[in-house]
Swiss-Prot record:
Domain of life where this protein originates: Bacteria
GO cellular component: cytosol
Record-given protein name: Polyribonucleotide nucleotidyltransferase
EC assignment: 2.7.7.8
Cited NCBIfam families: polynuc_phos (TIGR03591), pppGpp_PNP (TIGR02696), PRK11824.1 (NF008805)
Main subcellular location of this protein, as a coarse class: cytoplasm
Pfam families: KH_1, PNPase, RNase_PH, RNase_PH_C, S1
Single Gene Ontology BP annotation: mRNA catabolic process
CDD domains: KH-I_PNPase, RNase_PH_PNPase_2, S1_PNPase
Gene field: pnp
Residues that coordinate or bind Mg(2+): 515, 521
Taxonomic source organism: Nocardioides sp. (strain ATCC BAA-499 / JS614)
Enzyme class: transferase
């Protein structure tokens, strides 16, 4: 066997005072039977393998490009054994799914249009510095392995994460550095023929520290700052693309001839355009989505019937051409007349509605509507021990704020599968979570696990941004003290030549059809002061800076309008629901934790059983006590304090105790965990109507609750008790006890 021919190239990204990051690409050693394979390294201690493979035969019955991106997180990469029952990795976690989406979004548009062969890119995380995010390295590795594969691919695509730290945009920041970042942004793009970088995808968010950093005087991530971050990412993207090209020039396979299946031929398009364009233009002015869709469906059926004989066997082409004509009609109306599908102006927002408390008994609920998009937000609060436990390669091991997004088929008037979330739903939930994370209270300020569910009740454009609005309302109604309300809006862009001039038109609050027919999907969420999350996907080779600035300005204006409407529904946290748990926080010495827990959990379980409260103990001695009513939580707090922060009991103090043991000379009564006293048989007369008591069991039994008072404490701390009865009986018994002893 001959030695493999290994080729490699590396590039060093300079972050100035923050040091350098070295990215290395290598091919020829691993996965040699894949069409293209690349090993990518970041600073020699993080290693990914990306392998691209194409199916041998096209799926000509598909009307889409069958591209699959898979990310495999190997736990050995971090020196861990999986925590599952079978100790295997199992299904991909949320981080892996989100990384798949990050790769798919910029890669998919770069394949040749009409390709129908199945293409699969598998990225395996093989070694990982726990302080290093691997997602942007995976974008570059997937791009390069695809370039080497011989597929018709117009890459390379470069991806970089830049974070705003101490006023500087830092490339490939570590998790430690991100703790001091104001804004975190993943940007992907490619180098154009002019040498400029065309941005294809952006995924960005403020951090959990942003609010405090801004309050301490750090520059807030405003729209202008975010636009500057996009420019700062371009040199790094260009550098990574050049490194990919250098290796591809040495190791890439020749581009193979793959059959291309165009959606339609020109003759079909011309016939469809002549037959239906005028009527389609009228149909696309119908404001109501359902009526508009019904009319376009009618027109499509008419065209199929009219042209079916002329183009026999080419019905799929007629359908595709119909969609293309529809797209052209919508775009021309926007570019020429500045009029949109539903008759709105370019910056107009659809009618807004917001209300809270729409579901009984739940801890918080809200309904947010923007036109035909309708989102239900529901908040649930619980003890911190109910926060999500994560067994992934990420340093995040538990998640206090969980945000789930559900998109049922009825939200678009269709039937379909319900159940486990698809990748799109995972992505939308993650986007809404990132938008709200910077304004959530800390664990110390609000010691609750928070689960937010966003349900799309109706969909016609940007349910993800609607989820942000509905969630803000529901959280406030649940009593969560947000630092500021957050709203989101989806922007669009249409470009084209009109009378020989290239025009760009930014659209506010896009419909579903405008999203499909436009050139950009741009979602922006934030407070009144700054941006908290941003997501951008574009089909263009580049967006001029002034066009992007205009879109950001329109988004800010729309966001402020939406926040005003939300404030009319609720503008500050309400009182917590009577059905939500009440949580009390206390701190005990660390060396007392064992005493509170007791042998095999005996003491803590007894406190929980006696009071009905739930208790969670942190390693630092912080104890969270939760109960559905304040009395139970207070009783549990007193019981814990009696053990961990004890005060010596005094004669005359009264307790509601529990009989834990009976003997022939009396009953032992537990006043609190770890503190018992003796109720002598002679003191039971008052409970027996003043009669002599021959057997303790005739008066009290184990488990019985009894009100007692401390009559005496001896030198060894032993407690003598007397029962408390109505009137002054307890006091007379105490006096009688003293006279008998005399």
């Amino acid at each position: 066997m001959t030695d493999p021919e290994i080729s490699a190239v590396e590039t060093v990204l300079d972050n100035g005072k923050f040091g350098t990051r070295t990215v290395k690409f290598e091919t020829g050693l691993l996965a040699r039977q894949a069409a293209g394979a690349v090993t990518a390294y970041l600073d020699e201690d993080t290693m990914l393998l990306s392998a691209t493979t194409a199916g041998k035969h096209p799926k000509d019955h598909f009307d889409f490009f069958p591209l699959t991106i898979d990310v495999e997180e190997r736990m050995y990469a971090a020196g861990k054994i999986p925590g599952s029952f079978f100790r295997s990795e199992g299904r991909p976690g949320e981080d892996a799914i989100l990384t798949c989406r990050l790769i798919d979004r910029p890669l998919r548009p770069t394949f040749k249009k009409g390709l129908r062969n199945e293409v699969q890119v598998v990225i395996t995380v093989m070694a990982l510095n726990p302080d290093t995010p691997y997602d942007v390295l995976a974008i570059n590795a997937a791009s390069l392995s695809t370039q080497l594969s011989g597929l018709p691919f117009s890459g390379p695509v470069g991806g970089v994460r830049v974070a705003l730290i101490e006023g500087q945009w830092v490339a490939f920041p570590t998790h430690s550095q991100l703790e001091n970042a104001v804004f975190d942004m993943v940007v992907a793009g490619r180098v154009t023929e002019t040498g400029d970088v065309a941005i294809m995808m952006v995924e960005a968010e403020a951090t959990e520290q942003t609010w405090d950093l801004v309050r301490s005087g750090t520059q807030a991530p405003t729209e202008e700052i975010v636009a500057g971050g996009l420019d700062a990412a371009k040199p790094f993207i260009k550098q990574l693309c050049e490194a990919q090209v250098e290796l591809a020039n040495v190791a890439a396979k020749p581009v193979q001839d793959f059959p291309v299946f165009l959606d339609y031929e020109d003759d079909v398009y011309d016939a469809v355009e002549a037959a239906v364009k005028a009527e389609l233009a009228a149909a696309m002015k119908i404001a109501d989505k359902q009526e508009r869709n019904d009319r376009t469906d009618e027109l499509k059926d008419e065209v199929l019937a009219k042209l079916g004989e002329q183009f026999e066997g080419r019905e799929k082409e007629i359908g595709a051409a119909f969609r293309s004509v529809n797209k052209q009609v919508v775009r021309e109306s926007i570019l020429r007349d500045k009029v949109r599908i539903d008759g709105r102006g370019l910056a107009d927002i659809r009618p807004l509605h917001a209300e809270v408390g729409v579901i009984p008994r739940v801890h918080g609920s809200a309904l947010f509507e923007r036109g035909e998009t309708q989102i239900l937000g529901v908040t649930t609060l619980d003890m911190l021990k109910m926060e999500q436990q994560l067994d992934t390669l990420s340093p995040e091991k538990h998640r206090r704020y969980m945000h789930k997004y559900v998109f049922p088929p009825f939200s678009t008037g269709e039937t379909g599968r319900v159940g486990s979330p698809k990748r799109r739903e995972v992505g939308h939930g993650a986007l809404a979570r990132r938008a709200l994370l910077p304004v959530l209270p800390t664990r110390e300020e609000f010691p609750y696990a928070i689960r937010q569910l966003s349900e799309a009740m109706g969909s016609n454009g940007s349910t993800s941004m609607g989820s942000v609005c509905a969630s803000t309302l529901a959280l406030l109604q649940a009593g969560v003290p947000l630092k500021a309300p957050v709203a989101g809006i989806a922007m669009g862009l249409v470009s084209g030549e009109i009378d020989g001039q290239l025009q760009y038109v930014a659209l506010t609050d896009i419909l579903g059809a405008e999203d499909a027919f436009g050139d950009m999907d741009f979602k922006v969420a934030g407070t009144r002061e700054f941006v908290t999350a941003l997501q951008l996907d574009t089909k263009l080779d580049g967006i001029p800076a002034e066009v992007l600035a205009q879109a950001l300005t329109q988004a800010r204006d729309a966001r402020l309008t939406i926040l005003d409407v939300m404030a009319e529904a609720i503008d500050e946290p309400e009182e917590m629901s009577a059905y939500a748990p009440r949580i009390i926080t206390i701190t005990i010495p660390v060396d007392k934790i064992g005493e509170v827990i007791g042998p095999k959990g005996k003491i803590i379980n007894q406190i929980q059983d006696d009071t009905g409260a739930s208790i969670s103990i942190e390693d630092d001695g912080t104890i969270y006590i939760g109960a559905t009513n304040g009395e139970a939580a207070e009783a549990a707090k007193n019981a814990v304090n009696a053990i961990a922060n004890p005060t010596m009991p005094e004669v005359g103090e009264r307790y509601l105790g529990t009989v834990v043991k009976t003997t022939n000379f009396g009953a032992f009564v537990s006043l609190m965990p770890g503190k018992d006293g003796l109720l002598h048989i002679s003191k039971l007369r008052s409970l027996a109507g003043g009669k002599r008591v021959d057997a303790v069991e005739d008066v009290v039994s184990v488990g019985q609750k009894i009100q007692v008072q401390i009559a005496e404490i001896d030198d060894r701390g032993k407690l003598s008790l007397v029962p408390v009865v109505e009137g002054d009986q307890a006091d007379s018994d105490t006096a009688e006890a003293g006279s008998e002893e005399e």
